[in-house]
Amino acid sequence: MAMSFEWPWQYRFPPFFTLQPNVDTRQKQLAAWCSLVLSFCRLHKQSSMTVMEAQESPLFNNVKLQRKLPVESIQIVLEELRKKGNLEWLDKNKSSFLIMWRRPEEWGKLIYQWVSRSGQNNSVFTLYELTSGEDTEEEEFHGLDEATLLRALQALQQEHKAEIITVSDGRGVKFF
């Protein structure tokens, strides 16, 4: 059941692909770009990307309008997402990044709610069971990439709700 993506009205507006010089207009434009990136990545369950992939993806490249957001502007949008806690650079050159349409704390909260709701406190899970197991198929965190999952579990560990452990076939987590 693939859902289609609903592009915002701005995406069909050519000036959207040029960052505006007016401070107020630019802030609204950056907010719209950030919202678009997060919605797009969430729908496509895309959690990491390079800047070059981003530039060529439909996200920043409207083929129909023949407009593309310049790479310098993409960097500004990505930096705005980083400031909001939704992006983490994966290298010093800032050429690849982890996109988090939910912050790690939010993922942790969702996972912990599922654990509590299903009566599985004091249980141990492998990372695979959490993101790929049959029990989590209906959960939003099903299919979550390992890097984001670990950040979510680290957030829970800081709240003393979980402990990341080593199990025979890799890493796991015990929930309290």
Curated annotation (Swiss-Prot):
InterPro entries linked to this entry: ESCRT-II_cplx_Vps25-sub, ESCRT-II_cplx_Vps25-sub_N, WH-like_DNA-bd_sf, WH_DNA-bd_sf
Q: List, alphabetically, the GO terms of the cellular component aspect.
A: cytoplasm; cytosol; endosome membrane; ESCRT II complex; nucleus
What superkingdom does the record give?
Answer: Eukaryota
Q: Which Gene3D superfamilies match?
A: Winged helix' DNA-binding domain. Chain C. Domain 1, Winged helix-like DNA-binding domain superfamily/Winged helix DNA-binding domain
UniProt-listed Pfam families: ESCRT-II
Which terms in the Gene Ontology molecular function aspect does this entry carry? Answer: protein homodimerization activity; structural molecule activity
Taking the record's annotation, the residue ranges forming a coiled coil are: none
Keywords (A to Z) from UniProt: Cytoplasm, Endosome, Membrane, Nucleus, Protein transport, Transcription, Transcription regulation, Transport
GO terms under biological process: protein transport to vacuole involved in ubiquitin-dependent protein catabolic process via the multivesicular body sorting pathway
* Entry's localization field: Cytoplasm; Endosome membrane; Nucleus
Protein function: Component of the ESCRT-II complex (endosomal sorting complex required for transport II), which is required for multivesicular body (MVB) formation and sorting of endosomal cargo proteins into MVBs. The MVB pathway mediates delivery of transmembrane proteins into the lumen of the lysosome for degradation. The ESCRT-II complex is probably involved in the recruitment of the ESCRT-III complex. The ESCRT-II complex may also play a role in transcription regulation, possibly via its interaction with ELL.
Q: Which family does it belong to?
A: Belongs to the VPS25 family.
PANTHER family per the UniProt record, alphabetical: VACUOLAR PROTEIN SORTING-ASSOCIATED PROTEIN VPS25, VACUOLAR PROTEIN-SORTING-ASSOCIATED PROTEIN 25
Record note on quaternary structure: Component of a complex at least composed of ELL, SNF8/EAP30, VPS25/EAP20 and VPS36/EAP45. Component of the endosomal sorting complex required for transport II (ESCRT-II), composed of SNF8, VPS36 and 2 copies of VPS25. Interacts with CFTR; the interaction requires misfolded CFTR. Interacts (via C-terminal half) with the ESCRT-III subunit CHMP6 (via N-terminal half).
What's the name of the protein?
Answer: Vacuolar protein-sorting-associated protein 25
Originating organism: Rattus norvegicus
Q: What is the lineage of its organism?
A: Eukaryota, Metazoa, Chordata, Craniata, Vertebrata
Q: Which gene encodes it?
A: Vps25
